[in-house]
């Protein structure tokens, strides 16, 4: 049986609590436990890159981690992955800060990681690469003679050609991506956007619906919407509340709660969300004194100017809205710029009447799915969800809104606050059914199954891939 080798920018710590954070770690550990194998990634520390890999083995899984120099971390991670790819892939070209040394550093680190992984690989290993930090990784492995099956999953959106082609190195990135055997995306829109970018650059031959050839390289594209652990989330959400939370719930028993939790990131649409809540207060004064909106937004990448700007903007908007609409004994908006334990958040989800999840652009947004999974099926809250979140393709029974239209969001919030119990139960049941079917284990099992079905590349095909090809004639 083939081993599974997983490569991601960071690896979860090898202890029994690693999966408690949810998300990617749960899916990866599930796949690794099933097949046995290796999880390879950055240690999270800076230091001498020439030091031997740190290896830890538990059961049939080995964790292998490495350090990065401060220069490599800054250029590969901060300056290119997060200052070029992240904003561009979230349709924010105005925030892209392209610098040629950062691009060189991005390629250099991907090559370095390929060098470090190469001695660990076995001939029949199946390799699964994750996310935008490692777009060129398969290309670097192929250059080193690796013919193993290599899959890639992009957790964030893939932009349309008008956005992607603005990147000075877009053509190189596209050709490098074709060195993967299987390219996985969150949504069909993302998959088609990638193919549109590719067909604008070179001739793409499609042998079947999702099997393609470009530059002489054969690859497959597919959609794998990432899921969650609904049973675990329901378990975390149920049970007694911590004393302070129980006291707060008692104090707010006559108040309807709108709740939202996101990383402090410009892609999440937080300023637009605050303005939509203000529109609700303005257009529906009957809710004054009877509702409260709580926004939790812990700082991420606090040293980046764009993130500092949005933090200050939110602080100002929260103060302005509370000053305009607040009353003695009633504060309409609570904004908390701090981290909360994930299990506590699931309990807060459960007693919230409305979950407000309105990113401007998001690959999936697991918060939306977690909110649904945390609800009491007999008395569930209502999910208000952005049409630009990948989750909107699955959670069609949510109240789907355009986050740029504050009036539309306000109308949806009013509808959510006044929705009948019967409708709430019906909508929740439909969404929960989808979430249970497409859980995190289903996601990883589908990807790994498809990757296993691909015939490994041969040395001869690697040589054929080096034959010159020409761009599509326009």
Curated annotation (Swiss-Prot):
Coiled coil: none annotated. It comes from the Bacteria. The keyword Glycosyltransferase applies. The keyword Oxidoreductase does not apply. InterPro entries: Glyco_trans_20, Trehalose_OtsA. UDP-alpha-D-glucose binds at residues 22-23, 263, 268, 340, 366-370. Gene3D superfamilies: Glycogen Phosphorylase B. One of its GO terms (biological process) is trehalose biosynthetic process. The record marks 86, 156 as: Involved in alpha anomer selectivity. Its EC number is 2.4.1.15. It catalyses: D-glucose 6-phosphate + UDP-alpha-D-glucose = alpha,alpha-trehalose 6-phosphate + UDP + H(+). Disulfide bonds: none annotated. GO terms for molecular function: alpha,alpha-trehalose-phosphate synthase (UDP-forming) activity. Keywords: Glycosyltransferase, Transferase. D-glucose 6-phosphate binds at residues 10, 77, 131, 301. Pathway: Glycan biosynthesis; trehalose biosynthesis. Probably involved in the osmoprotection via the biosynthesis of trehalose. Catalyzes the transfer of glucose from UDP-alpha-D-glucose (UDP-Glc) to D-glucose 6-phosphate (Glc-6-P) to form trehalose-6-phosphate. Acts with retention of the anomeric configuration of the UDP-sugar donor. Belongs to the glycosyltransferase 20 family. Homotetramer. This is Trehalose-6-phosphate synthase. The lineage of its organism: Bacteria, Pseudomonadati, Pseudomonadota, Gammaproteobacteria, Enterobacterales.
């Amino acid at each position: 049986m083939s081993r599974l080798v997983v490569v991601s920018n960071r690896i979860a710590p090898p202890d029994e609590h690693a999966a408690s954070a949810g998300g990617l770690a749960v899916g990866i550990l599930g796949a690794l436990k099933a097949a046995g194998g290796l999880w390879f990634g950055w240690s999270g520390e800076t230091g001498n890159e020439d030091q031997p890999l740190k290896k830890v083995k538990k059961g049939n899984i080995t964790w292998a981690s490495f350090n990065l120099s401060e220069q490599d971390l800054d250029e590969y991670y901060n300056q290119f992955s997060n200052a070029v790819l992240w904003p561009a892939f979230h349709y924010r070209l105005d925030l892209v800060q392209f610098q040629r040394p950062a691009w060189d550093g991005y390629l250099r680190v991907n090559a370095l990681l390929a060098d470090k992984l190469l001695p660990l690989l076995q001939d029949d290993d199946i390799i699964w690469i994750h996310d935008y930090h490692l777009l060129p990784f398969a290309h670097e492995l192929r250059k080193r003679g690796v013919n193993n099956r290599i899959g890639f999953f992009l957790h964030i959106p893939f932009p349309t050609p008008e956005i992607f082609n603005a990147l000075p190195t877009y053509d190189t990135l596209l050709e490098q991506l074709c060195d993967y055997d299987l390219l996985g995306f969150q949504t069909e829109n993302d998959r088609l956007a990638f193919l549109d970018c590719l067909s604008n650059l070179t001739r793409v031959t499609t042998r079947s619906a999702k099997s393609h050839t470009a530059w002489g390289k054969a690859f497959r594209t597919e959609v794998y919407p990432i899921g969650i652990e609904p049973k675990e989330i329901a378990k975390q959400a149920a049970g007694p509340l911590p004393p302070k939370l129980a006291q707060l719930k008692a104090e707010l028993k006559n108040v309807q709660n709108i709740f939202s939790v996101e990383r402090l990131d410009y892609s999440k649409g937080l300023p637009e969300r605050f303005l939509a809540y203000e529109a609700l207060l303005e257009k529906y004064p009957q809710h004054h004194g009877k509702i409260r909106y709580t926004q939790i937004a812990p700082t991420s990448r606090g040293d980046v100017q764009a993130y500092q700007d949005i933090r200050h903007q939110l602080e100002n908007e929260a103060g302005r809205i509370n000053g305009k609409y607040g009353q003695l004994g009633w504060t309409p908006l609570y904004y908390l710029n701090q981290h909360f334990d994930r299990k506590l958040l699931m309990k807060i989800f459960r007693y919230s009447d409305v979950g407000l999840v309105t990113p401007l652009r998001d690959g999936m947004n697991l918060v939306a799915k977690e909110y649904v999974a945390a609800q009491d099926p007999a008395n569930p809250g209502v999910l208000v969800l952005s049409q630009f979140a990948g989750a909107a393709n699955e959670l069609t029974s949510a109240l789907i809104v355009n986050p740029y239209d504050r009036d539309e969001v306000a109308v949806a919030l009013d509808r959510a606050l006044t929705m009948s119990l019967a409708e709430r139960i019906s909508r929740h049941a439909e969404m929960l059914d989808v979430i249970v079917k497409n859980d995190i284990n289903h996601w990883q099992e589908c990807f790994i199954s498809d990757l296993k079905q691909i015939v490994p590349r041969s040395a001869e095909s690697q040589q054929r891939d080096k034959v010159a090809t020409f761009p599509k004639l326009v």
